[in-house]
Amino acid sequence: MSTKRNMKNENFVTFEVAKLLQDKGYREDCCASYITDETGRSELTVVFGVRKFRHLSIYTRFQYEYLAPTLYAAQKWVRTKGKIHIVVELNKHGWYYRLYDTEELSLISQMDGYTDTFEKALNDGIKESLTYL
């Protein structure tokens, strides 16, 4: 059984973050994408192959299509492209993120408040890091 078949929505960036990533130049191959119809409703579609940026939105029934990388792939892309490392930590209040500059080894930003899952904190950290790119 392929590991891709076991992937859940929480393993991928949210629709909002997928749009921001694409606006910032994310063009890596993915196994998932968000599609929107003419009403603006979005849906995550996981394929058992690879979605390439140049092949997005070739189907006329979709208004827009956005690459949907895994949280890890997006985190790595931000670290590579933006020189920003996203750290997710846990304390008695919940999960939170911190952003570090990988060249100056300094704290850039950290989350105000907490979330109930690691995945939400990482997604929020990716979203925040994109404001620095």
Question: Where is each model-derived feature located?
Answer:
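Ampiphathic alpha-helical segments that act as solvent-exposed interaction surfaces
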Residues: 111-133
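Extreme N-terminal leader/activation tails
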Residues: 3-43
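A generic signature of intrinsically disordered, low-complexity regions enriched in glycine/proline
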Residues: 33, 41, 105, 120, ...
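Intrinsic-disorder/low-complexity regions
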Residues: 5-10, 36, 90, 100, ...
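N-terminal segment of the canonical double-stranded RNA-binding domain
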Residues: 19, 27, 41-116
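Charged, low-complexity surface segments at secondary-structure and domain boundaries
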Residues: 1-6, 58-62
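Surface-exposed polar/charged interaction patches
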Residues: 24, 80-84, 128, 132
